[in-house]
Protein backbone atom coordinates (compact mmCIF):
# COMPACT_ATOMS: atom_id res chain seq x y z
CA UNK A 1 0.00 0.00 0.00
CA UNK A 2 1.43 3.41 -0.99
CA UNK A 3 0.35 6.82 -2.21
CA UNK A 4 0.04 5.51 -5.76
CA UNK A 5 -2.73 3.18 -4.60
CA UNK A 6 -4.50 6.07 -2.87
CA UNK A 7 -4.34 8.30 -5.92
CA UNK A 8 -5.73 5.50 -8.07
CA UNK A 9 -9.10 6.59 -6.66
CA UNK A 10 -8.69 9.90 -8.50
CA UNK A 11 -10.26 9.66 -11.96
CA UNK A 12 -10.12 11.92 -15.01
CA UNK A 13 -13.29 13.69 -13.88
CA UNK A 14 -11.62 14.67 -10.61
CA UNK A 15 -8.68 16.20 -12.47
CA UNK A 16 -10.94 18.00 -14.96
CA UNK A 17 -13.14 19.47 -12.22
CA UNK A 18 -10.11 20.48 -10.16
CA UNK A 19 -8.60 22.28 -13.16
CA UNK A 20 -11.87 24.16 -13.75
CA UNK A 21 -12.93 22.43 -16.97
CA UNK A 22 -15.85 24.01 -18.82
CA UNK A 23 -17.63 20.68 -18.31
CA UNK A 24 -17.17 20.65 -14.54
CA UNK A 25 -20.86 21.32 -13.81
CA UNK A 26 -21.85 18.23 -15.76
CA UNK A 27 -19.01 16.11 -14.38
CA UNK A 28 -19.44 17.02 -10.70
CA UNK A 29 -22.67 15.26 -9.78
CA UNK A 30 -23.87 13.99 -6.40
CA UNK A 31 -23.34 10.32 -7.39
CA UNK A 32 -19.82 11.08 -8.61
CA UNK A 33 -18.93 12.95 -5.42
CA UNK A 34 -20.30 10.18 -3.19
CA UNK A 35 -18.46 7.49 -5.17
CA UNK A 36 -15.19 9.45 -5.11
CA UNK A 37 -15.34 9.85 -1.33
CA UNK A 38 -16.21 6.16 -0.92
CA UNK A 39 -13.35 5.10 -3.20
CA UNK A 40 -10.83 7.13 -1.20
CA UNK A 41 -11.82 5.29 1.97
CA UNK A 42 -11.91 1.88 0.27
CA UNK A 43 -8.46 2.23 -1.29
CA UNK A 44 -6.94 3.29 2.04
CA UNK A 45 -8.39 0.46 4.13
CA UNK A 46 -5.30 -1.78 4.09
CA UNK A 47 -2.93 0.25 6.24
CA UNK A 48 -1.88 -2.35 8.79
CA UNK A 49 1.20 -3.83 7.10
CA UNK A 50 3.13 -0.63 6.43
CA UNK A 51 5.44 1.58 8.49
CA UNK A 52 4.00 4.33 10.66
CA UNK A 53 5.67 6.98 8.51
CA UNK A 54 3.96 5.69 5.36
CA UNK A 55 0.64 5.19 7.16
CA UNK A 56 0.62 8.80 8.35
CA UNK A 57 1.34 10.07 4.85
CA UNK A 58 -1.44 7.99 3.29
CA UNK A 59 -3.95 8.76 6.05
CA UNK A 60 -3.50 12.54 5.99
CA UNK A 61 -3.37 12.56 2.18
CA UNK A 62 -6.68 10.68 2.11
CA UNK A 63 -8.34 13.31 4.33
CA UNK A 64 -6.83 16.08 2.22
CA UNK A 65 -8.31 14.51 -0.93
CA UNK A 66 -11.66 14.23 0.85
CA UNK A 67 -11.50 17.98 1.44
CA UNK A 68 -10.55 18.72 -2.18
CA UNK A 69 -13.47 16.64 -3.43
CA UNK A 70 -15.86 18.34 -0.99
CA UNK A 71 -14.68 21.78 -2.13
CA UNK A 72 -15.32 20.76 -5.73
CA UNK A 73 -18.84 19.85 -4.70
CA UNK A 74 -19.28 23.22 -2.98
CA UNK A 75 -18.11 25.16 -6.02
CA UNK A 76 -20.62 23.25 -8.14
CA UNK A 77 -23.62 23.68 -5.87
CA UNK A 78 -23.69 20.26 -4.21
CA UNK A 79 -23.67 21.31 -0.55
CA UNK A 80 -26.74 20.20 1.41
CA UNK A 81 -28.06 21.00 4.86
CA UNK A 82 -25.87 19.84 7.73
CA UNK A 83 -28.71 17.73 9.10
CA UNK A 84 -28.72 15.50 6.04
CA UNK A 85 -26.45 12.56 5.44
CA UNK A 86 -23.73 12.27 2.83
CA UNK A 87 -20.31 13.70 2.14
CA UNK A 88 -21.72 16.82 0.48
CA UNK A 89 -23.25 18.18 3.68
CA UNK A 90 -22.05 21.47 5.13
CA UNK A 91 -20.47 20.00 8.25
CA UNK A 92 -18.55 17.23 6.46
CA UNK A 93 -15.19 19.08 6.86
CA UNK A 94 -15.68 18.87 10.63
CA UNK A 95 -15.75 15.08 10.33
CA UNK A 96 -12.62 15.17 8.17
CA UNK A 97 -10.91 17.46 10.69
CA UNK A 98 -11.80 15.09 13.53
CA UNK A 99 -10.13 12.20 11.73
CA UNK A 100 -7.13 14.35 10.83
CA UNK A 101 -6.67 15.48 14.42
CA UNK A 102 -6.87 11.86 15.57
CA UNK A 103 -4.17 10.86 13.07
CA UNK A 104 -1.89 13.75 14.03
CA UNK A 105 -2.36 13.34 17.79
CA UNK A 106 -1.61 9.61 17.68
CA UNK A 107 1.39 9.98 15.38
CA UNK A 108 4.99 9.86 16.49
CA UNK A 109 6.06 13.52 16.09
CA UNK A 110 9.22 12.51 14.23
CA UNK A 111 7.20 10.40 11.78
CA UNK A 112 4.77 13.26 11.20
CA UNK A 113 7.55 15.82 10.78
CA UNK A 114 9.45 13.59 8.36
CA UNK A 115 7.00 14.51 5.58
CA UNK A 116 8.16 18.11 5.66
CA UNK A 117 6.40 21.06 4.11
CA UNK A 118 4.01 18.83 2.16
CA UNK A 119 2.44 17.58 5.38
CA UNK A 120 2.17 21.13 6.70
CA UNK A 121 0.40 22.23 3.54
CA UNK A 122 -2.13 19.40 3.69
CA UNK A 123 -2.90 20.13 7.34
CA UNK A 124 -3.18 23.81 6.46
CA UNK A 125 -5.60 23.14 3.60
CA UNK A 126 -7.84 21.03 5.85
CA UNK A 127 -7.73 23.64 8.64
CA UNK A 128 -8.45 26.44 6.17
CA UNK A 129 -11.51 24.66 4.81
CA UNK A 130 -12.70 24.00 8.35
CA UNK A 131 -12.29 27.70 9.19
CA UNK A 132 -14.41 28.64 6.16
CA UNK A 133 -17.20 26.30 7.28
CA UNK A 134 -17.08 27.63 10.84
CA UNK A 135 -17.31 31.22 9.57
CA UNK A 136 -20.37 30.37 7.47
CA UNK A 137 -21.95 28.66 10.48
CA UNK A 138 -20.78 31.14 13.10
CA UNK A 139 -24.24 31.38 14.67
CA UNK A 140 -24.57 27.62 15.14
CA UNK A 141 -24.04 26.64 18.77
CA UNK A 142 -24.59 22.90 18.34
CA UNK A 143 -22.06 20.38 19.62
CA UNK A 144 -20.96 19.62 16.05
CA UNK A 145 -19.71 23.14 15.47
CA UNK A 146 -18.33 23.52 19.00
CA UNK A 147 -16.26 20.41 18.31
CA UNK A 148 -15.25 21.93 14.97
CA UNK A 149 -13.75 24.93 16.75
CA UNK A 150 -11.87 22.59 19.05
CA UNK A 151 -10.48 20.65 16.08
CA UNK A 152 -9.40 23.90 14.44
CA UNK A 153 -7.58 24.96 17.60
CA UNK A 154 -5.83 21.58 17.82
CA UNK A 155 -4.75 21.71 14.17
CA UNK A 156 -3.37 25.22 14.57
CA UNK A 157 -1.57 24.13 17.72
CA UNK A 158 -0.01 21.25 15.79
CA UNK A 159 1.13 23.66 13.06
CA UNK A 160 2.72 25.86 15.72
CA UNK A 161 5.31 23.17 16.47
CA UNK A 162 5.86 21.27 13.23
CA UNK A 163 9.48 20.27 12.70
CA UNK A 164 10.43 22.10 15.89
CA UNK A 165 9.22 25.50 14.78
CA UNK A 166 6.17 27.46 13.77
CA UNK A 167 4.85 26.51 10.34
CA UNK A 168 4.79 29.22 7.69
CA UNK A 169 1.08 28.45 7.27
CA UNK A 170 0.15 29.10 10.89
CA UNK A 171 -0.23 32.86 11.15
CA UNK A 172 -2.29 33.26 7.95
CA UNK A 173 -4.61 30.56 9.32
CA UNK A 174 -4.88 32.24 12.73
CA UNK A 175 -5.74 35.50 10.97
CA UNK A 176 -8.29 33.70 8.80
CA UNK A 177 -9.88 32.06 11.82
CA UNK A 178 -10.49 35.45 13.41
CA UNK A 179 -13.35 35.44 15.90
CA UNK A 180 -13.89 31.69 15.61
CA UNK A 181 -11.23 31.14 18.24
CA UNK A 182 -12.97 33.50 20.65
CA UNK A 183 -15.49 30.70 21.16
CA UNK A 184 -15.28 28.05 23.83
CA UNK A 185 -12.42 25.57 23.77
CA UNK A 186 -11.60 22.85 26.29
CA UNK A 187 -9.67 23.56 29.46
CA UNK A 188 -5.93 23.15 29.08
CA UNK A 189 -5.59 24.04 25.40
CA UNK A 190 -2.50 26.21 24.84
CA UNK A 191 -2.82 29.74 23.53
CA UNK A 192 -2.04 30.28 19.85
CA UNK A 193 0.27 32.99 18.50
CA UNK A 194 -1.52 36.15 17.46
CA UNK A 195 -1.84 37.04 13.76
CA UNK A 196 0.07 39.88 12.17
CA UNK A 197 -1.26 43.22 13.37
CA UNK A 198 -2.47 41.79 16.67
CA UNK A 199 -2.86 44.50 19.32
CA UNK A 200 -5.07 42.74 21.81
CA UNK A 201 -4.19 40.19 24.43
CA UNK A 202 -4.60 36.56 25.26
CA UNK A 203 -6.27 36.02 28.60
CA UNK A 204 -7.66 33.15 30.60
CA UNK A 205 -11.36 33.06 31.40
CA UNK A 206 -13.51 30.80 33.47
CA UNK A 207 -16.58 29.64 31.58
CA UNK A 208 -18.01 27.30 34.19
CA UNK A 209 -14.96 25.12 33.85
CA UNK A 210 -15.39 24.70 30.10
CA UNK A 211 -13.18 27.46 28.80
CA UNK A 212 -9.50 27.97 29.40
CA UNK A 213 -8.28 30.59 26.94
CA UNK A 214 -9.53 32.85 24.22
CA UNK A 215 -7.91 35.12 21.68
CA UNK A 216 -8.96 38.76 21.81
CA UNK A 217 -8.29 40.97 18.81
CA UNK A 218 -8.22 44.73 19.16
CA UNK A 219 -11.04 46.57 17.43
Task: Name each model-derived stretch.
Residues 4:
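Aromatic (Trp/Tyr) and acidic
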Residues 9-23, 36-57, 70, 77-219:
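Fungal C-terminal regulatory tails
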Amino acid sequence: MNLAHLFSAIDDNFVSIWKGSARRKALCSEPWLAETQRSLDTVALSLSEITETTRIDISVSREWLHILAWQMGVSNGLVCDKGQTGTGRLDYPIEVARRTVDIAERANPLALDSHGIGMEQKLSDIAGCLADVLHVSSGDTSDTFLHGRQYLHLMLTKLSMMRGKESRYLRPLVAKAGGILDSQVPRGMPALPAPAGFEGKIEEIDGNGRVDRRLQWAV
